Amino acid sequence: PQYEDLMTATSNLTGKKVNRFTHLHQSTDDLIKKVKMQRLLGQKTAACFQRCVGMDAANAVYSTTFETDEACGTKYHENFVKFWTDVQNNDWGVDGAMTDVKGDRGLSPSKQADPDLFLHVVERTADGVYVTGAKAHQTGYLNSHYVLVMPTISMREGDEDYAISFACPTDADGITLILGRQSCDTRKTEEHNDIDVGNKVYGGHEVLVIFDRVFIPNDMIFLNGEVKFAGMIVERFAGYHRQSYGGCKVGVGDVLIGATALAGEMAGSSKASHVKDKLIE
């Protein structure tokens, strides 16, 4: 109850109270509460809480699908609203997936020596599409119910198969996950490690997600070949996600500053000018 105003919001889709991580921003106040929520959770967990990317992806795709439909006569916005209503009603965790492995940065997706360096459509049917490729550096994927996939860069004519956005279950047929390690992973298995603050059970898992002819039904597709709108998703996501970093990283920074100040007190050096200068900076 203490943090209910920060952690929940009223859905513009259903009128119900929802987890703010599933909320679609409607005002400046929503954006302020979002970043305050993220700073609070950074302070409380001192770790990545893994739902920010999905929230930022949803807000980018929500507005972009509306504009795509207006320009192209598609039904992507209707698809997304239906999907996201289910997300809100069930409080599903959603991983936002943007980063491709990319290959030669000087070439567009369709000009790469290996076509799978960017996730793309390999077959279209009356019922949907099959996609192949990979998304890298997926921090919250293992702990999410769904993945919301977006293009990673602006597209141009010839890149139509790469201008694709969709959602699917994180364990859909054809998906393989490669788990990355962190240098301090084994600390979680040591005895008497309760001194560590943070999410010791679920924090820090990062995967490379490989899609091998994964089928995406039509009603889960939010962009499919409309190249000029790929960049719009990227730009809007980037704006939302930069704001998120201004919350979560600052919250974790608060913990680091506090821990450093405590270490200074315990070492008897808290009044040293160079220690105070570093803490103030």
Regions found by a protein language model. Give the residues of each.
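Conserved short loop/turn motifs at secondary-structure junctions
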Residues: E67-G73, V101-K102, V275-I280
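Internal helix-loop-helix
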Residues: Q2-V94, G140, Y146
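Generic secondary-structure signature for well-ordered alpha-helical cores
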Residues: N89-W92, I216, L262-E265
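Conserved aromatic-histidine-acidic binding/catalytic patches
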Residues: T68-K75, N199, S244-C248, A267
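Short, well-ordered alpha-helical packing segments
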Residues: V81-Q88, L119, A126-G128, K135, ...
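FAD-binding core of flavoproteins
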Residues: T99-C248
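Extended amphipathic alpha-helical segments enriched in small hydrophobics
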Residues: S244-E281
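Intrinsically disordered or highly flexible coil/loop and linker segments, enriched in small
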Residues: N89-G96, D100, M220-I221, S269-S273
